[in-house]
A protein has these predicted regions:
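Short, solvent-exposed loop/turn and secondary-structure capping segments
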Residues: 262-265, 285-287, 348-352
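Cell-wall glycan-active module
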Residues: 2, 22-251, 325, 352-376, ...
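Bacterial N-terminal signal peptides
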Residues: 11-19
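A short, structured beta-strand-centered segment in the mid-to-C-terminal lobe
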Residues: 295-306
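Short, functionally critical alpha-helical segments immediately adjacent to catalytic or ligand/cofactor-binding
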Residues: 236, 243-264, 274-276, 310-311, ...
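Substrate-binding/active-site groove segments that recognize
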Residues: 266-293, 308-316, 364, 390
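Acidic helix/loop microenvironments that form the catalytic cleft of cell-wall polysaccharide enzymes
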Residues: 253-258, 306, 313, 324-355, ...
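Bacterial N-terminal signal peptides that target proteins for export
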Residues: 2-10
């Protein structure tokens, strides 16, 4: 690894460790941590981890500091994009999103992108050496790593180029079959399939100053259904706990993330139900769990926690913010729209006066309420489309 790559990798590792720990990121703090680690001959990551734990303890005494640190998280995510751009180029600086899993490896010279909406896996490697055979080997290794990435989300850090820790059942188990139409689950089959892909499906293209070697793998046709079943126990439990229809929870998950547990967004929404920690997460902590603060990104990447918190927020919308809406169908339309754009914007669709808005909703038929919430009367175009999508997907469950 050259010096430039080492510095880039170190910078990302530092930022990521602080991100995942929920720490305030400042140039002074990073410099202090790195200098301390280097001068003492210790691993800087150990010092960073210690600093992160110290920061987490401070949240117990001052939970509002977490809001400030979320702003630092946004900056750190922008920095991560900058690092990807520095290595791959402006058109290739892919980062995780709501419906795309993105994992860099091999010092950020390899990446895997799973488009859960399109059902497509792409694995790519930069050809920045004089030996094409070496690049092909690196691509083959990246394919194997991706196919065998464990389902245990705590073993995978999507914000760094670190390899997944641990083993166990693959995250993509059942969703990828090899050239013999057999499910890829074990290392020997993953290696065999990766070798076949590199030999027969390799594509080459340009990115910045280097060639890119890549292969694409289509997920099986029922990949969404398979992912749905992985989380069915959590959905059913949450539905019972919060008096919700399982079909509604499934439809929201499909709309928000296409069942991508690693989903992240520019609005700091995480996981399957795209929970925003500072708003929905804080509401659930304070109103349901009766504790201060808000969930961490680690909690929201946990499928069980994410589904519980997202469902609890639906419960809050249903029993508190929009409880005045009497018709069950109208209230469902209202809470779905509010899950995306807030209860305030739902009510503004009908009147600037909240009490008056509820009265208007109660006088209207559910179909009219739906049309109003999906029309230009609602202040947010995204929320209009969101309600349409959720109700469309709900029919499939």
């Amino acid at each position: 690894m050259n010096k430039k790559t080492q510095l880039i990798s170190l910078a990302v590792a530092i930022a990521t460790t602080l991100i995942l720990a929920g720490c305030e990121i400042t140039p002074h703090k990073v410099q202090r941590v790195v200098t301390s680690g280097v001068l003492s001959g210790n691993d800087p990551a150990a010092a960073i981890e210690s600093l992160a734990k110290e920061r987490l303890r401070s949240y117990r005494n001052n939970p509002h500091q977490l809001i400030t640190d979320i702003e630092d998280l946004r900056k750190a995510l922008r920095d991560l994009r900058t690092v990807a751009e520095a290595i791959w180029g402006e058109e290739e600086n892919t980062v995780p999103s709501e419906k795309k899993y993105v994992k860099y490896s091999d010092d950020f010279h390899a990446k895997a992108v799973i488009d859960f909406e399109q059902g497509l896996l792409t694995v790519a490697t930069l050809h920045d050496s004089d030996d094409p055979a070496q690049t092909r080997q690196q691509l083959q290794a990246a394919i194997v790593r991706t196919l065998l990435t464990p389902a245990d989300l705590t073993a995978v850090d999507i914000f760094t180029a670190n390899e997944p820790k641990g083993s166990g059942k693959p995250f993509l188990r059942g969703q990828v079959v090899d050239h013999d139409k057999v499910v890829v689950e074990y290392e020997w089959r993953a290696n065999r399939f990766a070798e076949y892909l590199v030999e027969t499906k390799l594509r080459k293209r340009r990115a910045k100053e280097n060639d890119v070697y890549e292969v694409q793998i289509a997920l099986v046709d029922d990949h969404k259904e398979l992912r749905k079943h992985q989380y069915s126990d959590y959905v059913i439990a949450a539905a019972k706990r919060y008096d919700l229809e399982p079909e509604l929870i499934y439809a929201i998950i499909e709309t928000e993330s296409s069942f991508n547990p690693y989903a992240v967004s520019h609005a700091n929404a995480y996981g399957l139900m795209q929970v925003v920690a500072a708003t929905a997460g804080r509401d659930v902590f304070e109103r349901i769990r009766k504790i201060p603060g808000q969930p961490t990104s680690q909690q929201l990447f946990n499928p069980a926690q994410n589904i519980d918190i997202g469902s609890a927020y639906l419960y809050i919308l249903n029993t508190q913010y929009l409880k005045g809406v009497r018709n069950a169908n109208s209230r469902e339309y209202a809470i779905v729209s509010a899950y995306n754009g807030g209860a305030g914007n739902v009510l503004k669709t009908f009147s600037s006066n909240r009490n008056r808005a509820v009265e208007i909703i109660n006088r209207r038929q559910p179909g009219t309420v739906y049309r109003d919430l999906t029309s230009s009367k609602h202040p947010l175009p995204e929320s209009r489309r969101y309600l349409e999508k959720v109700m469309y997907f709900k029919q499939d469950y």
